[in-house]
Amino acid sequence: MTAENQQNNVTLGALCMCAAMIAGTSIDISVKALAPTYSTAQIVFLRSAIALPLVLALVWHRVGLSALSTAGWGWQLWRGLLTAGASFGFFYGLIYIPLVTALMLAYVGPVLIVLLARPLLGEHISPGRLVGVMLGFAGVVFVISPGSLTIEPAIWSILGSALCWALLSISNRQLATKVSTPVLTFYTYPVSLVIAAVWTWGAWITPAPMDWLLFSVTALGSALAHGFAALAYRYAAAGVVAPFEYTALIWISLAGFLFWGEVPAWTVWVGGSAVILGGIVALRG
């Protein structure tokens, strides 16, 4: 691969991760709106139930249904469990923690990816890229006022979700050259669907008409987020694209202002600038 092609792949990987974060923001907004009424399990169940046939149609159109049988069952079960852990953990946390704060806690994920990429993938993490990730993480820490958080189950739930997401991202990188993106995306849903169905049994609340729209947004946003994230790790190393998960801060801040009238504090803008700078450093590192 020429240096120019390699740089193009890095750029595509970064853009795909940015797109994944935009899609992910739509999920967070919808879940935050649904959480006061519906259980975490029902949200995960309907998200998975709506998304699964959409992604199945994409698999049929792009690579054929036969590709599902060659995806590596052990890996896909592992990825399904990680997806369930990430979904349940983050959605539960959103019930008790403000949206932006939950996102800040979840931002430990990219740092975990960099730390895990070397032992699990054997990827070389250059000093420049490591500095970029740490700079981005420092920006996230700056946004959170010291002493503003207390140790509670919801916080541990978000942090556990971040660990699951980091391991899922690592597995995406491991399988990206072996399994097509539609197939990778498809197998993120069945395990969550089964677990959520069992958990929802006997506690079902029939959604209001407008809430069906929000559930549909969580499904479509989830499919797009998983798809773009898988593409990102296909194009570039985990240590390169991970910092671009921080760009979700921009969209979450805008959503908070547009939908809830929230005006981010100056610390958000300063920390956000550090996050963006960290992404640039990682890209060039």
Task: Give, region by region, the residue ranges found by the protein language model.
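Loop-to-transmembrane-helix transition segments
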Residues: 11-19, 59-60, 64-89, 153-161, ...
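Hydrophobic transmembrane alpha-helices of multi-pass small-molecule transport proteins
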Residues: 128-144, 267-284
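Helix-helix packing/entry segments at the starts of transmembrane helices
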Residues: 46, 102-108, 175-191, 226-257, ...
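Structural signature of hydrophobic alpha-helical transmembrane segments
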Residues: 39-51, 92-109, 151-164, 208-222, ...
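Transmembrane alpha-helical segments that form core, pore/gating elements
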Residues: 29-32, 40, 55, 147-207, ...
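Transmembrane alpha-helices of multi-pass small-molecule transport proteins
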Residues: 12-13, 37-85, 164-168, 187-202
